[in-house]
């Protein structure tokens, strides 16, 4: 995981970074599933369960789970295709549509089952991968800023003047310090896409203009806001004024049944003698403000009929640099560190997660693997030549085998000891022949007596020694016979 994160940090391409982050999250997810499966198999083997016997129940259980969890299987398949086809990555601004769901936001995590996004209101939404039928990615490779805005034709000489003024305002917006680094292509102007006649008395004719420019991925909203602001600033007098049927510009609209405006100071003699407290306070505040800033007071007198004209370019720049929800939703690809920074309210959760640095499931997995490894080390069987104790978890079985061997070999030696005594008492040829017959009889009868006894290595060795003892006197007997027969054969 650290190698992947280092590669993500050193990657220069934003798309590569997003894809690597997505694959890293899914890789950890799959590794945990495989590790838990191997842990379960190892535990079953340690407790003596037969995996061959569990194959049939596992097949039946998997079939039942597959029928009951079809949606989960569909989510896993959809997640696999999302990752392999690189439909979107971590940090992309996407919009999901389908099955009655329309939600958009920044992708913060992708797993095999679901995708987590954070909306512009900082709400975390979890969407199963198979639920969203249509996915619209606004941050793939590059984007295009599209501004469609109606422009009044009242203050311009002709349509060419309207097009020139609006295009000049748009180019000023694209040349700003914050906007220029995000521009990738040339400005494309579509003039007079629509003409809107006045619908009520006093409204001017409007011509709709469309401006298009290629920008970096995810920054189209920033460029669009800057273009609209600059166009409004250029046509401020036309937007902020009202017209009459004769075309004369006036400061405010005259609407029928308009309620009379109440003056702050009553001009009656009684009111002049005893002014109201609210009116006096208002007059005092106005006087104080006029004394503090004379220039602002002059500007307010000039624009008294239209207070909206007090907004100048400084106010517009402040609005442009104000809070931008789309930019705040843009993720930060820089990694804050190797360990996690999760917060858990319970004490046992903090202990299992090592203070929020790792997942609790990872801690449990490592603990179980350590416990199984400890039991495996304690149950290691020594070699056959090992003389010391094997441990209480692996008792030795050599003692019981030695006892049974000594008990079974003892009865075999009894009939073999009687064979040499008969051989020593035969001095003649006739007795030698009888002795050979007698000696051959016990040799063949010895295995018959030991039929009820289990054969061992010691019994076999003793039978071989018995046969050798019986054969040695038999060899000497013919020598003695030849010596005794030689004198008798002469006459």
UniProtKB/Swiss-Prot annotation:
InterPro entries: LSM_dom_sf, MscS_beta-dom_sf, MscS_channel_2nd, YbiO_bact. Keywords: Cell membrane, Membrane, Transmembrane, Transmembrane helix. Signal peptide: none annotated. Its main location: membrane. Residues 384-393, 432-449, 481-491 have a biased composition (Polar residues). It is found in: Cell membrane. Residues 313-326 have a biased composition (Acidic residues). One of its GO terms (molecular function) is mechanosensitive monoatomic ion channel activity. Residues 279-291, 394-431, 462-473 have a biased composition (Low complexity). The chain crosses the membrane at residues 21-43. Residues 266-332, 384-491 are annotated as: Disordered. It is a single-pass membrane protein. GO terms for cellular component: plasma membrane. This is Uncharacterized protein Cgl1270/cg1434. It comes from Corynebacterium glutamicum (strain ATCC 13032 / DSM 20300 / JCM 1318 / BCRC 11384 / CCUG 27702 / LMG 3730 / NBRC 12168 / NCIMB 10025 / NRRL B-2784 / 534).
């Amino acid at each position: 995981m650290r190698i992947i994160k280092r590669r993500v940090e050193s990657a220069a391409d934003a798309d590569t970074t997003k894809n690597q982050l997505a694959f890293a999250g899914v890789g950890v997810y799959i590794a945990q599933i495989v590790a838990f499966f191997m842990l379960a198999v190892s535990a079953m083997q340690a407790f003596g369960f037969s995996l061959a016997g569990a194959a049939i129940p596992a097949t039946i259980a998997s079939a039942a789970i597959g029928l009951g969890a079809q949606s989960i299987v569909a989510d896993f398949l959809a997640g696999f295709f999302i990752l392999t086809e690189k439909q979107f990555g971590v940090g992309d601004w996407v919009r999901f549509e389908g099955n009655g769901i329309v939600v958009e936001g920044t992708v913060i995590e992708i797993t095999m089952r679901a995708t987590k996004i954070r909306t512009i209101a900082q709400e975390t939404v979890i969407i199963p991968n198979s639920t969203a039928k249509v996915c619209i990615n606004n941050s793939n490779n590059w984007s295009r800023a599209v501004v469609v805005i109606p422009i009044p034709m009242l203050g311009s000489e002709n349509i060419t003047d309207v097009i020139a003024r609006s295009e000049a305002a748009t180019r000023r917006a694209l040349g700003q310090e914050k906007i220029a680094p995000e521009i990738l292509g040339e400005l494309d102007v579509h003039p007079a896409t629509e003409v809107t006649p006045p619908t009520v008395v006093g409204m001017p004719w409007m011509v709709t203009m469309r401006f298009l420019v290629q920008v970096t991925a995810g920054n189209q909203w920033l460029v669009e806001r800057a273009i609209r602001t600059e166009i409004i600033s250029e046509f401020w007098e036309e937007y902020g004024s009202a017209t009459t049927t004769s075309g004369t510009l006036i400061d405010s609209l005259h609407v029928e049944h308009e309620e009379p405006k109440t003056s702050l100071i009553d001009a009656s003699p009684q009111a002049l003698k005893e002014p109201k407290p609210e009116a006096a306070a208002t007059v005092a505040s106005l006087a104080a403000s006029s004394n503090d800033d004379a220039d602002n007071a002059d500007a307010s007198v000039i624009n008294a009929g239209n207070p909206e004209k007090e907004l100048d370019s400084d106010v517009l720049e402040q609005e442009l640099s104000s809070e931008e929800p789309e930019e705040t939703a843009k993720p930060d690809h820089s990694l804050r560190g190797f360990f996690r920074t999760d917060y858990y309210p319970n004490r046992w959760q903090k202990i299992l997660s090592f203070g929020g640095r790792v997942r609790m499931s990872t801690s449990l997995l490592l603990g179980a693997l350590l416990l199984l490894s400890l039991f495996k080390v304690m149950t290691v069987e020594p070699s056959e030549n090992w003389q010391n104790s094997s441990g209480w978890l692996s008792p030795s079985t050599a003692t019981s085998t030695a006892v049974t061997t000594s008990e079974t070999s003892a009865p075999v030696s009894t009939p073999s000891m009687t064979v040499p005594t008969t051989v020593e008492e035969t001095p003649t040829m006739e007795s030698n022949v009888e002795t050979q017959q007698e000696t051959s009889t016990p040799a063949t009868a010895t295995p018959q007596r030991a039929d009820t006894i289990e054969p061992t290595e010691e019994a076999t060795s003793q039978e071989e020694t018995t046969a050798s003892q019986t054969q040695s006197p038999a060899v000497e007997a013919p020598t003695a016979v030849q010596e005794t027969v030689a004198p008798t054969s002469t006459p």
